[in-house]
């Protein structure tokens, strides 16, 4: 996304997102709202929705579903998955549009209008979206922190990072090396100063645990069997399986199964 020149690192996620990111109406609402009440809330939100050149309402809702799916998948996967930088770019651009509209309506607000209620509903919905973005980014940064040496020595895995995440990795790694050197490593023999030494019985490079157990749901009835030792598991559509990530990863990548 370098051509769009969006500084994801400097974006203030606390500012909120586009009010169009709301769940579509359901016939049975868990909060006990009727269809008419849900439609009324949608109408209020529409009044605060700015003109958005980045997509239709359906496309915006699809972006939120994709973000939710990406967050769940990232949490379940022990490895760093390809970044959703383009998705975050679209959502964060809508943040800027929504901020302008909210500020304008807050300034022009009069006690005889329903603007206060409109803004309250929009801000409540924005909190949910902000939570998804923060959680998604925190999960990715946690993986980078836990396996810093591994990602530093793995150019292929670094391709899954955004430019901002690669900058974070390089800066954090440099700070950590400098701290260790000044605190204790300068007193060690040269043969013991390497932070990525894997010559001994225990490697200093902490790699992602590919045998981490994961929950998956089969979404395509392929009829394939997975052999695990003397046992086998058949991938039937709708079935839920707990299995090692290393065994199921190729089916996740092909879209036959999804994390839950």
Swiss-Prot record:
Subcellular location: Nucleus
Entry keyword set: Chromosome partition, DNA replication, Nucleus
Region feature Disordered, mapped onto this chain: 1-33
InterPro entries membership: GINS_A, GINS_bundle-like_dom_sf, GINS_Sld5, SLD5_C, Sld5_GINS_A
Keyword Oxidoreductase: no
GO cellular component: GINS complex
GO biological processes: chromosome segregation; DNA-templated DNA replication; double-strand break repair via break-induced replication
Free-text function comment from the UniProt entry: The GINS complex plays an essential role in the initiation of DNA replication. Has a role in chromosome segregation.
Quaternary structure (record): Component of the GINS complex which is a heterotetramer of SLD5, PSF1, PSF2 and PSF3.
Protein's recorded name: DNA replication complex GINS protein SLD5
Gene: SLD5
